[in-house]
């Protein structure tokens, strides 16, 4: 059986910023936690008490354009970029107090959360955690979206992105073994993106109240609108891998598998994560 020591942060760290969808400011307070706590978000209720929202599939509330968790009256939106950084750095136990309903977007990538982990430092804890391994393939398909996971001794993600409506994105493919180093260098810097012709719809729906060129890349047929150039020629597919890592972290336990994805988004990622969890619990 694969196993490693559990991890938390060495000290508390804070970060304030604006949420990309709601457009409201929020402050994160990341606090070390004891072994076997898991990742737990906290929102302060009207009475002043903190409501716990474990970062688990059971608490996924919505998956439109981002992944939102909820428990009781507490809601935490857009958790995927933070969760991807925690998962890829093997952070198992953490209390995350959030003053608002949405995680700050930073620059649209996971860089700010990797930097927070570095500021706090990583604490190796006494207890071990088992790393689950699939014993059979797992599949999910909905229309032209496809996901599969195969037994492996490492976490590897192979993603195919197909955007026929955008000649500047087109078809992109990336396959990568996910570990702390590869995530930091190859995935964490990759920003969220949108198509130019989607922006009016998103604005009308109030879905990008905090979106700007400081935290997203906009793709047009004849180029991009961005602060600077793309960080990678295939930045969109890499960001899709980032989102997938964050969503699958809600399985709630570390696991290894070779994950294949074609055109998946938050809704399909979460549905697929539930199938993986079922397979691991057999």
From Swiss-Prot:
Domain of life (superkingdom): Bacteria
Substrates-to-products reaction catalysed: a UDP-3-O-[(3R)-3-hydroxyacyl]-N-acetyl-alpha-D-glucosamine + H2O = a UDP-3-O-[(3R)-3-hydroxyacyl]-alpha-D-glucosamine + acetate
GO molecular function list: metal ion binding; UDP-3-O-acyl-N-acetylglucosamine deacetylase activity
Keywords carried by this UniProt record: Hydrolase, Lipid A biosynthesis, Lipid biosynthesis, Lipid metabolism, Metal-binding, Zinc
Entries under InterPro entries matching the protein: Ribosomal_Su5_D2-typ_SF, UDP-acyl_GlcNac_deAcase, UDP-acyl_GlcNac_deAcase_C, UDP-acyl_N-AcGlcN_deAcase_N
Cystine residue pairs: none
UniProt pathway annotation: Glycolipid biosynthesis; lipid IV(A) biosynthesis; lipid IV(A) from (3R)-3-hydroxytetradecanoyl-[acyl-carrier-protein] and UDP-N-acetyl-alpha-D-glucosamine: step 2/6
Active site: 266
EC number assigned by the record: 3.5.1.108
Amino acids binding Zn(2+): 81, 239, 243
Family: Belongs to the LpxC family.
Role this protein plays: Catalyzes the hydrolysis of UDP-3-O-myristoyl-N-acetylglucosamine to form UDP-3-O-myristoylglucosamine and acetate, the committed step in lipid A biosynthesis.
NCBIfam families: lpxC
Protein's name according to its UniProt entry: UDP-3-O-acyl-N-acetylglucosamine deacetylase
Organism: Chlamydia pneumoniae (Chlamydophila pneumoniae)
Upper taxonomic lineage: Bacteria, Pseudomonadati, Chlamydiota, Chlamydiia, Chlamydiales
């Amino acid at each position: 059986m694969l196993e490693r020591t559990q991890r938390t942060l060495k000290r508390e760290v804070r970060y304030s910023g604006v949420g990309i969808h709601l457009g409201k400011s929020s402050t994160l307070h990341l606090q070390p936690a004891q072994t076997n706590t898991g990742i737990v978000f906290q929102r302060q209720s009207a009475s002043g008490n903190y409501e716990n929202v474990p970062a688990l599939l059971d608490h996924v509330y919505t998956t439109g354009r981002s992944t939102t968790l909820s428990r009781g009256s507490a809601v935490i939106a857009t958790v995927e970029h933070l969760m991807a950084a925690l998962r890829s750095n093997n952070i198992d136990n953490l209390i995350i107090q959030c003053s608002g309903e949405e995680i700050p977007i930073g620059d649209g990538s996971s860089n700010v959360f990797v930097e927070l982990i570095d500021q706090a430092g990583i604490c190796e804890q006494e207890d071990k955690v088992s790393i689950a391994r699939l014993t059979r393939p797992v599949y999910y398909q909905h229309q032209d979206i496809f996901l599969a996971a195969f037994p492996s001794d490492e976490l590897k993600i192979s993603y195919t992105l197909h955007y026929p409506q955008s000649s500047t994105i087109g078809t992109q493919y990336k396959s990568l073994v996910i570990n702390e180093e590869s995530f930091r260098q190859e995935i964490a810097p990759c920003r969220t993106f949108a198509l130019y012709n989607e922006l009016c719809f998103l604005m009308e729906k109030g879905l990008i109240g905090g979106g700007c060129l400081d935290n997203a890349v906009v793709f047009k047929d004849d180029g991009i609108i961005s602060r600077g150039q793309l960080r990678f020629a295939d930045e969109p597919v890499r960001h899709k891998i980032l989102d997938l890592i964050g969503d699958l972290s809600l399985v709630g336990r570390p696991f290894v598998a070779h994950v294949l994805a074609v055109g998946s988004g938050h809704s399909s990622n979460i549905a697929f994560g539930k199938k993986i969890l079922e397979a691991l619990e057999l």
